[in-house]
From Swiss-Prot:
Organism: Mus musculus
One MF term in the entry's GO annotations: neurotrophin TRKA receptor binding
Lipid-modified residues, N-myristoyl glycine kind: G2
Segments of skewed composition (Basic and acidic residues): 117-131, 227-240
SMART domains listed in its UniProt record: IRS (SM01244), PTBI (SM00310)
Domain of life of the native organism: Eukaryota
Main location: membrane
Post-translational modification: Phosphorylated on tyrosine residues upon stimulation by FGF2 or NGFB. Phosphorylated by ULK2 (in vitro). Phosphorylated on tyrosine residues by activated ALK and FGFR1. Phosphorylated on tyrosine residues upon activation of FGFR2 and FGFR3. Phosphorylated on threonine residues by MAP kinases; this inhibits tyrosine phosphorylation, and thereby down-regulates FRS2-mediated activation of MAP kinases. Ubiquitinated when tyrosine phosphorylated and in a complex with GRB2. The unphosphorylated form is not subject to ubiquitination.
Name used for this protein in its record: Fibroblast growth factor receptor substrate 2
Assembly and interaction partners: Part of a complex containing FRS2, GRB2, GAB1, PIK3R1 and SOS1. Part of a complex containing GRB2 and CBL. Binds ALK, CKS2, FGFR1, RET, MAPK1/ERK2, MAPK3/ERK1 and SRC. The tyrosine-phosphorylated protein binds the SH2 domains of GRB2 and PTPN11. Interacts with NTRK1, NTRK2 and NTRK3 (phosphorylated upon ligand-binding). Identified in a complex containing FGFR4, NCAM1, CDH2, PLCG1, FRS2, SRC, SHC1, GAP43 and CTTN.
High-level lineage: Eukaryota, Metazoa, Chordata, Craniata, Vertebrata
Amino acid sequence: MGSCCSCPDKDTVPDNHRNKFKVINVDDDGNELGSGVMELTDTELILYTRKRDSVKWHYLCLRRYGYDSNLFSFESGRRCQTGQGIFAFKCARAEELFNMLQEIMQNNSINVVEEPVVERSSHQTELEVPRTPRTPTTPGLGAQNLPNGYPRYPSFGDASSHPSSRHPSVGSARLPSVGEESTHPLLVAEEQVHTYVNTTGVQEERKNRASVHVPPEARVSNAESNTPKEEPSNPEDRDPQVLLKPEGVRFVLGPTPVQKQLMEKEKLEQLGKDPVSGSGAGNTEWDTGYDSDERRDVPPVNKLVYENINGLSIPSASGVRRGRLTSTSTSDTQNINNSAQRRPALLNYENLPSLPPVWEARKLSRDEDDNLGPKTPSLNGYHNNLDPMHNYVNTENVTVPASAHKIDYSKRRDCTPTVFNFDIRRPSLEHRQLNYIQVDLEGGSDSDNPQTPKTPTTPLPQTPTRRTELYAVIDIERTAAMSNLQKALPRDDGTSRKTRHNSTDLPM
């Protein structure tokens, strides 16, 4: 960089100027190299000197900055005008300069990005650091400690601050900048970090928070936390709620129509059963639905793994379905509104109503169409005209009976589908037939005894699977004779254009 000379405006700038400060550039040994005026604008840091133009450092390119008594220093990045380097300046108002720069950083929400560095102990003595000036490429690169634990930077004119393409990252010996915690308003407290459902440690973290607003259905005393919990209210009577929490908003949705139908069905089934099974359900803990290590051990008979199933589950296709919906009526009742008992970190996007599917049926032959069984009504209000495994419906806790895979296409022509149907029916092939022509060439090319083509009276099968012997055969010799006759015709019919290149061609 070279040494800095005295600034021409040194005497004209008052000592108490708001954003201009008189500074003296120093090296790492504290030797004064030159004086100047440091100005802080809204976007950049400017140093005015006498024998050169002003030097500017944009705030976004500053890696760190700090001060110690009467010394202000900062580190610039590669994108600055001076390139990568560390600069130190003596200033009687170093603290004011630092506070003003920090305030500008906060007002503009500028976050100084720190790279992963090697931590250095704060009790490092000056004897451990060589006193000679050095560049960042020197293996013994270190930083002289200041009373506040942050390193003293090389001078403005030191070789270490000179931009060079050979310079490695100075961050290899970097420490967090002065006032870093207060400088970065974008840092979020740990309690405000978004935690998603099915994350390990969510339940334990929420148990340790006393200030978290617990929803009414999950509000239990400490004495009752170790005892089996019961459902606070009937899920059918629960209304949608919006709960405000310090970490976000939770939407508690009511049961879907499909869940209401299943709950009514379970109530009717439980009326005819022994009430002992209902009392035994109170001795089991509720499944929170979290796929974490904190899930408590519950007998597999009374525990149900709840999932939002995409597509209907078929008992006959157990190897394809994803949800395990094989449990007793007691566990179904416990988990029928399982999502309402969950305690997610933020928004609860569950129990969404199912969407109508888009059918894409394949064409069936007449034999398959006639062998299909009676039509089965759908559980979600739509026609089961297709294979249920190809219906991408967001259906929750719905089990399709084994007869649901039987499809009736014969009745489908008479009813109007309630959803989009891209099945374009082709006309029936009952009255269509294709007659092939057979030409017998055993007689050779004898023109005196022409062969009469034979037309078969019996139609061929609709879908031939192998080659047949009845194909149209081309007479090669007759075709060649017709071709030669065509070539013998005059080529000039009066429409072709005559040029000097083809005017000598005479008609044949």
